[in-house]
A protein has these predicted regions:
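Non-DNA-binding regulatory cores of transcription-related proteins
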Residues: 77-155
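A short acidic, leucine-rich amphipathic alpha-helix
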Residues: 51-57
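Basic amphipathic alpha-helical segments that dock to polyanions
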Residues: 68-78
Length: 155
């Protein structure tokens, strides 16, 4: 997904706001776009395009997965949807406003755990102090082992 680094997130809290935000851009609010927005709002947590297609319960055919991806990309370019990768799994998508958290991804079991952005401030500060680099975790979560998998590995 190509998203301008200076794009402004468009935070929405309900379907009416999401639909209005799409219309303000001059884009049509197609049936597929509506279904994708409805699925994202219902989830309120990061989900994959496949999860969206599966959750539509036959309202879109499996061959329409490409349509789900196209709509997610368009909604991302508009600033309505945040996209990131969690470990080795598929990309995950969340509506802006529900994605204003940072994520930790378990590379063993796939657990995706959200944390407040402030929880990673120490990490950001350490990276900046060490290299001058301003770290962000909006596209890639911190990958490691969840407490359960780490305990299993320790034995």
């Amino acid at each position: 997904m190509t998203v301008s680094p200076d794009r402004k997130p468009v935070v929405v809290t309900d379907l009416d706001e999401a639909f209005a935000a799409v219309r303000r851009t001059g884009l049509r609010l197609t049936a597929a776009r509506r279904l994708v927005l409805e699925a994202l709002l219902a989830a309120r947590t990061p989900i994959s395009a496949e999860d969206i297609a599966d959750g539509l319960g036959g309202r879109m055919t499996q061959s329409d997965i490409a349509s789900v991806y196209r709509n997610l990309e368009t909604l991302g370019e508009l600033g309505l949807v945040r996209h990131f990768h969690a470990g080795h799994g598929p990309g995950r998508y969340v509506l802006e406003g529900f994605g204003d958290r940072e994520y930790l991804a378990c590379e063993s079991c796939g657990l995706l755990e959200s944390v407040e952005p402030a929880a990673l401030e120490t990490v950001r500060d350490a990276v900046r102090d060490l290299s001058g680099f301003e770290a962000g975790f909006s596209h890639f979560p911190i990958v490691g082992l969840c407490a359960r998998c780490a305990q299993k590995r320790r034995g």
